[in-house]
Amino acid sequence: MVLRRSRRIAILSSLLGLFLLYHFVSFRPELYSRTYDAAAAAAAADPSECPDLPGMEDVLVVMKTGVTESLDKVPIHFKTTLRCVPNYIIFSDFEEEIEGVKIHDALRTMDSVVKDTVADFDLYNRLREQGRAGLDNSDFADEANSNIGKPNNPGWKLDKWKFLPMVQQALLHKDNAKWYVFMEADTYISWPTLLQWLAHFDPREPHYIGTETQIADVIFAHGGSGFVVSNPAMQLATNEYATRTIELNEYTDWHWAGDCVLGKVLADAGVPLHYSWPILQNSNVGELDEFAKGFYRKPWCFPAVGFHHLSKREIQDLHAFEKRRRQETDNPVLLHRDVFKELIYPELSNVRDSWDNLSDQEHPTINTFHECQILCAGSRHCAQFVIRDGICFTGETPRLGVSNPAVRSGWVLSNIDRMIDKAPRCSRPDFGV
């Protein structure tokens, strides 16, 4: 790729950027004005459906998706995570409507030179010319995630370019929001818990909050886990992008992770990341280790605000779970303790067929389920076991796991009960601040 570097082009690009900024601010229509009505209608139809969310009016929820997943993954959020949210906007690589809600093109304000010359934009340009008819089967082909993402997936290659323009457009969409909460289409956020957590931060200060991840020397918030940016930090990031557009486009082209690019921009602007783990998770419920020992924090008494890598069914189940909790308790804060006791523990049993509980301590000389069960039951430090490919694995902390027809799992409930009894009482949530 060759990006134009001459002084003349730089000046023209800057003038074009200022024109677009003026035009967008001065003449933009309401990008999505029905969210207030949707939230009010949901509350009127069923008061239990929408919890009291004081402060949510000062939050803009920003969802990022892509054309190859949006029709499948976005609609469930209209019935769950977004149902009672007064202000939200959804960005993709293709502008369209889904169930009457406008999906915005995150890349529409980007430099056309980049979009016309960078190979990553092949999918985007086909969409602009042909709409969804321009998609082919290879665009939907899944690819296993590697340590550098999915470099052969057209949608994934395009995704990194969305972050900086998305931040810019989100700020323009609601420039008076105190907080901007970014999520993806396979993310779930507990809004009551989020608001209780954010109450410990001053929105007048620049904040960048998320699950800490590192590539080279850049520490950034993992995008899929969800992350939060205050209004002053959004302004700083937008100013950086506006004044360093060519440089940052070159950096994005060289890089492979857009959330890392955003983290670098914020760091350059003097806004370091506030670490949020385990409050925001890059895991679904089945993968959670609520008794984790090997990290700098133990999840048990921390709020559980966000989950990632969720199916539509899992998002629906979490929404129903929170609705049920509202009817049973006045406490708006969901702790990891509650997730374990109320969601995970009831699913554990002595034996569970067609299930992998993700035990990872290998015992290669033990090859039968019965022997593996005896081994685990004989240790006070063993919480679970599994036979996987004819080999016994055990685990010292209980996890729910995932469906797998070729695997058989089990848990030692007496040991797990002992762990629960010894766990902290959580007299107050640990908000990590």
Tell where the protein language model's regions lie, with residue ranges:
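Active-site-proximal specificity loops/subdomain of glycosyltransferases
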Residues: D93-A177
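Conserved catalytic core of nucleotide-sugar-dependent glycosyltransferases
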Residues: T187-D268, P272, L280, D330-V339, ...
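Short, well-formed alpha-helical segments that are part of the catalytic scaffolds
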Residues: D46, E69-T81
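Short, acidic, metal-binding catalytic loop of nucleotide-sugar glycosyltransferases
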Residues: M56, I76-Y88, E95, G100
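C-terminal catalytic/acceptor-binding lobe
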Residues: V2-A39, W254, C260, V265-V433
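Acidic donor-binding/catalytic loop of UDP-sugar-dependent glycosyltransferases
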Residues: T68-L71, N176-A177, A185-W197
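Short aromatic/hydrophobic "clamp" motif used to bind/position activated sugar donors
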Residues: Y180
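A conserved hydrophobic helix/loop-capping motif in glycosyltransferases and polysaccharide synthases
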Residues: L60-T68
